[in-house]
Amino acid sequence: MRLRNKPWAKPLIEENPDFVVTEPTKLKGKWHTRFQNNNPIFVEIGMGKGRFIVEMAKKNPEKNYIGLELQTVAVGIALKKQLEEKLPNLQLICANGSGLGEYFEKGEIAGIYLNFSDPWPKKRQTKRRLTYKTFLEQYKEVLDSNGHIEFKTDNQGLFEYSLVSMNNFGMKFDGVWLDLHSSPEAEDNVMTEYEEKFSKKGQPIFKLEAHF
C-alpha cells in the first residue's frame, strides 16, 4: 500500500545514518560489524511502518533485526519508533527487497520474515510475489544452514500460492496455521499494523514457517 508523501521523512532518514542504511551493498558480509556483535540476524522484507520489527527487537535483545522497506515514508515512520526506543539490535534499510542477494553474504542471515506482502493478484504479476521461485532462490542463498522463513498474510490466494511455490522449490514446512489468532501460536505472536486491523474485522490470518 502506497503511503501519502511526508516531506519530513527523507531528511529524517538522512539525519540518522546510525539507524538507517541507504547503501546496504557496502555492508554485504559485514553486518556483524554494524551491530558490533555476532548475534544471529533476522530480516523483515517489507517492514511497512515498522511495528513488527521494533517489537521483535525489544522482545529479543539477544538477536539482531533488520527492517527492509522501499517506501521512504514507511522507513521514516519506522525510524521515529526506533528513535524513541534506540534499540542497539535494530537497523533499518531503505532499499528494494529484490536486491537481497546484493545486501547479504551467503549464510549471513538466520531468518526472514514476510508479513502481509503485496499479493500481486494478476497472473502477469506472479514474478513480483515475494514467494516466487526467484525470491526463494535469494532467500536460500543468504540464509544459514538452519535458517527459516516465517510468512503471514490475510490473503488466502497468496497463502495457497506460497504453499505450492515453496513445496515445488523443495522447502520443508515446520508449521502451517489457517487461523493463527485462534491457535496456541497466537500467545507469542507479534502483530503488524495491518494484522491488527484485519484481525479486528474477523479476518483469519494465515501463517507458515518453512526451511530449505
Curated annotation (Swiss-Prot):
Keywords: Methyltransferase, S-adenosyl-L-methionine, Transferase, tRNA processing. Its EC number is 2.1.1.33. One of its GO terms (molecular function) is tRNA (guanine(46)-N7)-methyltransferase activity. Substrate binds at K122, D154, T192, E193, Y194, E195. Gene3D superfamilies: Vaccinia Virus protein VP39 (3.40.50.150). It catalyses: guanosine(46) in tRNA + S-adenosyl-L-methionine = N(7)-methylguanosine(46) in tRNA + S-adenosyl-L-homocysteine. S-adenosyl-L-methionine binds at E44, E69, N96, D118. It comes from the Bacteria. Pfam families: Methyltransf_4 (PF02390). InterPro entries: SAM-dependent_MTases_sf, tRNA_(Gua-N-7)_MeTrfase_Trmb, tRNA_methyltr_TrmB_bact. Pathway: tRNA modification; N(7)-methylguanine-tRNA biosynthesis. The active site is at D118. GO terms for cellular component: tRNA methyltransferase complex. Belongs to the class I-like SAM-binding methyltransferase superfamily. TrmB family. Catalyzes the formation of N(7)-methylguanine at position 46 (m7G46) in tRNA. This is tRNA (guanine-N(7)-)-methyltransferase. It comes from Ligilactobacillus salivarius (strain UCC118) (Lactobacillus salivarius).
